[in-house]
């Protein structure tokens, strides 16, 4: 299959909600329009940062359909099709492809520990079900091991539509280097976790990062400066955005609040509603997030 690998920033579009916690379609269309104006090539939903685990399967398909329709080819839409059941994940993926998604993404099932043979069977079954569609495999396993470089190589050799890999773990440079070496750069490697390690990893040859949408345009500038050798500019911008990313990622549910508050501060969203169970920040956290977000709004206007 012919596919030009993506690079740069691929942000996660959050799921906006009304007061009754139903999906806010108009707000989602605003988010897609904002993404299309960030200088990026693609955006992803519904992922962890979209609260996918609080959506019904019908809602997961709905947000992708809306995004594809609103993007109208301006950027590519990566449709996350997560489900711990292979049968259900395949059904989601095939429906997303039918609905116009350009790329499909799948998270390694991590509810319970599984041996690599089980994960190989699961991922291979998924990839073979949509052989003509590029797929990103995400492994988000806080505090635990992620799939090994040898596993990644074997999966890629037997499934050529396995085009992208997203890993989210600290001190990952040696592992990223090994993956790039043994796959000969044939997999587009992306760092998650808000892009927190991007300045270290970009010189190693990773394709890009997958942060929240609220900082997508800012981190795209960081990406461009870093790969073009404008390191002082890259660091000067990144040093100003890092406190917000670091603070918000202390807790995934706190991230939803901080991300939606940032998008509201930037005039894209009208509220920061997350579906319950949701993190209820204390007064100090609310105040500090507001301060951090104000600084990012000013930074976005400067650059």
Residue ranges and their predicted role:
Residues 10-14, 38-39, 197, 203-206, ...:
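C-terminal alpha-helical cap/extension of soluble enzyme domains
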Residues 30, 62, 154, 233-237, ...:
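Short, solvent-exposed alpha-helical surface patches in well-structured domains
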Residues 2-145, 263:
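Active-site beta->alpha loop and helix N-cap motifs at the rims of alpha/beta catalytic domains
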Residues 75-76, 134-135, 163, 187, ...:
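Secondary-structure boundary/capping signal
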Residues 28, 60, 64, 89, ...:
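A general structural signal for well-ordered alpha-helical segments in protein cores
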Residues 127-131, 140-252:
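Catalytic alpha/beta core domains of metabolic enzymes, predominantly
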Residues 27, 59, 151, 284-285:
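Single-residue recognition of alpha-helix capping/boundary positions
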């Amino acid at each position: 299959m012919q596919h030009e690998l993506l690079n740069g920033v691929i942000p996660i579009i959050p799921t906006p909600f009304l007061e009754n916690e139903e999906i806010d379609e108009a707000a989602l269309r605003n988010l897609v329009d904002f993404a299309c104006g960030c200088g990026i090539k693609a955006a992803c939903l519904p992922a962890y940062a979209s609260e996918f685990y609080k959506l019904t399967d019908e809602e997961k398909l709905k947000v992708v359909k809306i995004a594809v329709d609103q993007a109208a080819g301006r950027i590519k839409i990566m449709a996350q099709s997560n489900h711990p059941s292979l049968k259900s994940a395949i059904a989601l993926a095939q429906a997303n492809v039918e609905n116009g998604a350009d790329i499909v993404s799948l998270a390694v099932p991590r509810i319970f520990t599984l041996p690599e043979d089980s994960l190989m069977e699961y991922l291979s079954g998924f990839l073979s079900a949509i052989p003509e569609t590029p797929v990103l495999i995400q492994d988000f396993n806080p505090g635990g091991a992620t799939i090994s470089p040898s596993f990644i190589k074997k999966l890629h050799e037997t499934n050529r539509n396995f085009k992208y890999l997203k890993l989210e773990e600290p001190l990952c440079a040696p592992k990223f280097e090994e993956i790039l070496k043994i796959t000969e750069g044939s997999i587009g490697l992306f760092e998650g976790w808000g892009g927190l390690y991007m300045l270290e990893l970009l010189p190693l040859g990773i394709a890009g990062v997958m942060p929240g949408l609220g900082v997508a345009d800012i981190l795209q500038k960081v990406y461009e400066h870093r790969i073009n050798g404008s390191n002082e500019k890259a660091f000067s911008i990144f040093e100003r955005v890092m406190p917000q990313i670091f603070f918000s990622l202390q807790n995934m549910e706190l991230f939803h609040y901080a991300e939606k508050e940032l998008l509201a501060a930037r005039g894209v969203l009208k509220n920061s509603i997350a579906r319950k169970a949701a993190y209820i920040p204390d007064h100090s956290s609310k105040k500090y997030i507001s301060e951090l977000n104000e600084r990012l709004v000013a930074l976005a206007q400067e650059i």
